[in-house]
């Protein structure tokens, strides 16, 4: 609004909505990230990295729980990225179990929601149920972000359910000794797994935990919404 009141040639004014305002907006957000938000985020990221490094792989049960919770908490955000970076660092040392757990913990959220929709569709709106194909594709391709809309619509119930499922999935992955010598790819890199059956077992167990919690915690949506096509 302020920019529209500033005198400027008509040739420039026509660029306001398509170029000038977006450019100024991106610049402002960049400055805020660097000089205001960036410091605290970096501090939290470093603290999380130090915590994972201190755990190492000596206590696999605790590592699986923490790693799974971090992967599912923000699904692509800082916590997720720290856990992924830790898995990449472990790969560099020849430890592929951490990446195996990372795969499982990343796949569990969309797969768990998909199972919950199949089991109890009355807990979900018609638009959410229509996301089933995308959730299954996200699970197959290790794209956790497909679960974000569900977490955003009901974070108090959905996020803890996703975290619990991923924590269980990661822990089962460590217990089975799953290793994956690939940085990403989901089911499409099954050839890089020491045992694809272990991968499926861990992912399904974690997803069932997520689905069960969602079915228990979420309330039924209005009947007319369930019946709507």
Model-derived features: positions:
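Pore-lining transmembrane helices
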Residues: 1-227
């Amino acid at each position: 609004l302020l920019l529209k009141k500033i005198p400027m040639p008509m040739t420039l004014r026509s660029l306001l909505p398509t170029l000038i305002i977006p450019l100024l907006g991106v610049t402002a957000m960049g400055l805020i990230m660097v000089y205001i938000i960036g410091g605290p985020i970096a501090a939290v990221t470093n603290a999380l990295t130090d915590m994972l490094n201190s755990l190492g792989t000596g206590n696999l049960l605790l590592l699986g729980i923490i790693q799974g919770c971090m992967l599912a908490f923000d699904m692509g955000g800082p916590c997720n990225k720290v856990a992924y970076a830790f898995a990449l660092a472990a790969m560099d040392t020849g430890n592929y179990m951490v990446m195996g757990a990372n795969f499982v913990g990343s796949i569990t959220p969309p797969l768990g929601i998909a199972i919950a929709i199949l089991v109890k569709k009355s807990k979900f709106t018609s638009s959410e149920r229509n996301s089933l194909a995308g959730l299954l594709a996200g699970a197959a391709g290790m794209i956790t972000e497909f679960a974000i809309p569900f977490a955003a619509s009901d974070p108090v119930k959905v996020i803890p359910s996703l975290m619990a499922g991923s924590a269980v999935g990661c822990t089962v992955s460590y217990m089975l000794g799953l290793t994956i010598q690939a940085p990403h790819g989901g089911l499409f890199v099954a050839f890089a797994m020491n045992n694809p059956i272990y991968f499926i077992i861990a992912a399904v167990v974690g997803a069932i935990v997520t689905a069960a919690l969602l079915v228990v915690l979420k309330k039924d949506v209005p009947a007319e919404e369930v019946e709507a096509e």
